[in-house]
Amino acid sequence: MRKYFLILMVSFLYSCHSDNCSKKLSFELDYHLFEDIKINGKTYCELVNGALKGDKDSILKLSKISIGDFGSYQHGAVLIEIIDIVTIDKYLIIVSSLSEKEKKQLYYTIWAGLEFTPNPKYKGKHIETIFPELKELLGIDNVPAG
């Protein structure tokens, strides 16, 4: 009886922590950091899935989200995955309409994502060298390349 109870509890806990975004990302997303985010009735995960399919509206909404603390590192890594899939050229067109404040926030979010991403193509790189066009669009001139 204990064995069945344990299996039931493990299954329940696993189902609570699973999400449908991480399956499409190259890393496991700590979904609890994002579970309260809803934009126009869409969850963070729905926006991520839409963005990974190239949906411009989802990409723009995700690029505008401001998340604090550790969540910003993971959110930045998500944005890097999106840029990698949709290409930097398409991403630049989509985010070109951001306000100056949103552009500054996006810069720091992607900077944090470069610190967090497990993708060897981007991990530990600087935004100035890996995405110079994005840095130019975002207008962040006074930040050193590191």
Q: What is each residue range found by the language model?
A:
Residues K53-S63, I88-V95:
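Amphipathic alpha-helical scaffolding segments comprising HEAT/armadillo-like alpha-solenoid repeats
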Residues C21-I39:
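N-terminal low-complexity, Pro/Thr/Ser-rich intrinsically disordered segments
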Residues E28, K38-L47, Y73-G76:
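Boundary/linker elements of alpha-helical solenoid repeat scaffolds
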Residues Y4-L13:
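Sec-dependent N-terminal signal peptides
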Residues L33-E35, E46, S63-G68:
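Second-shell loop/turn segments in exported
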Residues H17-S18:
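Bacterial signal peptide processing site
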Residues F70-G146:
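Extracytoplasmic electrostatic interaction patches
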